[in-house]
Amino acid sequence: MHELIESKGVPIKAWTNGVPVEPEARKQLKNIAELPFIHGHVAVMPDVHLGKGATVGSVIPTKGAIIPAAVGVDIGCGMAAVMTNVTASRLPDSLKGMRENIESVIPVGQASHKQPPRRAEAAWYQRHKAGYEAIEAKHPKIMEKKSAALQIGTLGGGNHFVEICLDEADRVWVMLHSGSRGIGNRIGQYFIAKAKEEIEAAGLKLADRDLAWFGEGTQTFNDYVEAVGWAQDYARSNRDVMMGAVLAVLRETWPDLETSDVAVNCHHNYVEREEHFGERVWLTRKGAVRARKGELGIIPGSMGAKSFIVRGLGNPDAFESCSHGAGRAMSRTAAKERFTLEDHLAATAHVECRKDPGVIDETPMAYKDIDAVMAAQADLVEVVHTLRQIVCVKG
């Protein structure tokens, strides 16, 4: 069940029972709720925390406007997961080689492919090149770096990951988390700056400059919708190509590996035209997953906690949404100051993963309790599978 957060604007309905919400995040949510074009109310997921531009874990319905900073710069960031026919009994004694093999085919961090693999090249030419060129013709500054074709099938950094997991029946799953990489970042930054320029030129004063918007019917609105739609499609392809590469690596160990019908590829940072409460609106999910009735989604825990394949319950008050993970309990800086490498080693003892100072900001203790997050959204989703990580590749 949700609780109400009071605001001077539309109601804020928050699925946060038993989950802490920072005062700064509450303030940010109230700023969103006071915008003049919010439709009905703002929904807040239990993994909510302070974000850049808008609150992570918020679902924002708008009429006649889109806020580029609410979508953010990792446009189309999301998850993919597939179940295989392989079981835990067939795992090798050491999983280090499996992790290294995945790292050999998936560039991580800032890295790109030096030469795109066939899957990536096919995706670029068949699905993305024409749209890229159309955006480039109108906004050449976005496309100054020619990395987009070389970054399909690459992971990125931060909280992006590739994981090998086991479910409740000890079946092997592949799960990964990534978005639109450098090109999505440039599209986001470019249009966020444009929106701020337009609002300032109009003489409008905002409680938060990051909440600048494009009004529907303007050229910049249309250009943003075109560019953000392209980036969201690119992000989905990025996950598809990575999934294909990981499965190919696993087939070197298990030539008879097959995938089941249970496969999910879902965004959690995006904007889309949807119908809610009888009205067509622009719905921005900022760190939230669509959870229509019967629809499968993915809610990952941290790199040491369990994750969930869920089925949506189609809750209308949540705009048919659920959380996109556990949610950070503290900032990356705070995590680095608070936790030691020894803390991280203890928390990830059961996972074959990076165990160095470079990933302490992603240590499990930096995230909220995933069980509390799931309990808070029991009326949004039901759990179909529970996954535990055994291999984790981080950017």
Question: For each of these PLM feature ranges, what is it?
Answer:
Residues 33:
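Beta-strand elements of modular eukaryotic interaction domains
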Residues 69-134:
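A generic, well-ordered mixed alpha/beta core segment in the N-terminal half of proteins
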